Amino acid sequence: MRDVFICDAIRTPIGRFGGALAGVRADDLAAVPLKALIEPNPAVQWDQVDEVFFGCANQAGEDNRNVARMALLLAGLPESIPGVTLNRLCASGMDAIGTAFRAIASGEMELAIAGGVESMSRAPFVMGKAESGYSRNMKLEDTTIGWRFINPLMKSQYGVDSMPETADNVADDYQVSRADQDAFALRSQQKAAAAQAAGFFAEEIVPVRIAHKKGETIVERDEHLRPETTLEALTKLKPVNGPDKTVTAGNASGVNDGAAALILASAEAVKKHGLTPRARVLGMASGGVAPRVMGIGPVPAVRKLTERLGVAVSDFDVIELNEAFASQGLAVLRELGVADDAPQVNPNGGAIALGHPLGMSGARLVLTALHQLEKSGGRKGLATMCVGVGQGLALAIERV
């Protein structure tokens, strides 16, 4: 297996649901970070990019018909570059990076772009076809998040718990208290607010320019953060699934919009295209768990990856764990033997504060882990996340 390097990485700001990026189509949004990779890398012969891999979880609206291909064309990349859209739900963007890594490591490719996009604000309502000409049981499905067009066999065999219900299942099964969840959520908000104030995220963000009748709006900051959050305010929120449960809007991730893109290259491509390697991709691994506790999915994925690499979780200087819910984040950390407030975990906050645009988030985790390693001087970084329907994904990098 050959070395594979991440040579550049950029993302858009993360928009709040119905917020600043709500007017931007998913394909246009995906084109923003792709286009932003071109100017800083003038020596790259772009027509020699082997593939653009892009993750996207929905694909029911404007992100249909292979958004990766449409976005690369909209970004002005050569028509000769093929593009493919991957869907591993929440981990789609990370899977795109891992897929590019494997193709280059095997020798099949030399140069690729990988990333992800999601516009949850613009997720459409959809309706299936009638089973008869006079059917009256038509159902309109909201594609923003969660189940749709449920298979009766899936429901009877595994259940079709909503995402908040799976988070409460994890809280119950792994004994994660409401107090611990709220404290975890508060730390996420505080760390993200501090990082934003210090300009940490500005270095990984490309502004999104939105034209309108009165001129132009420039979106350049993540807008989901709530720096005014207090523990008192979090404790007052009502549980989503009933009074005896613990998951709330405050200790869960957001519904958001965003896109990210990274350049991956072999050692030969680095030299040929004048690229600067920033990190080496060490590997990626996935794991499966019961769908009702999908949030614990990172545990088998991380264990598989660390065993394969011959390292321990404690060897990672940065761990970017997607905060789908505080309950699952805490359960994962405890199962992996990591302290609730370990300084190497999400040092700049996580999805509870920053938001969780599904197809983008996995790429954002890898990008932010790389950025933090460069800032801190650390060597190894781990990005991991749970996945709907009971999966986990983990990817490791090493700064060079």
From Swiss-Prot:
Positions of the catalytic residues: C90 (acyl-thioester intermediate), H356 (proton acceptor), C386 (proton acceptor)
Associated pathway: Aromatic compound metabolism; beta-ketoadipate pathway; acetyl-CoA and succinyl-CoA from 3-oxoadipate: step 2/2
Entry's EC annotation: 2.3.1.174
Enzymatic reactions: succinyl-CoA + acetyl-CoA = 3-oxoadipyl-CoA + CoA
Record SUPFAM superfamilies: Thiolase-like
Molecular function as annotated in GO: 3-oxoadipyl-CoA thiolase activity
Pfam families, per database record: Thiolase_C (PF02803), Thiolase_N (PF00108)
Domain of life: Bacteria
Keyword tags: Acyltransferase, Aromatic hydrocarbons catabolism, Transferase
CDD domains (alphabetical): thiolase (cd00751)
Classification via NCBIfam families: AcCoA-C-Actrans, pcaF, PRK09050.1
Family per record: Belongs to the thiolase-like superfamily. Thiolase family.
Primary role: Catalyzes thiolytic cleavage of beta-ketoadipyl-CoA to succinyl-CoA and acetyl-CoA.
UniProt protein name: Beta-ketoadipyl-CoA thiolase
Gene that this polypeptide is encoded by: pcaF
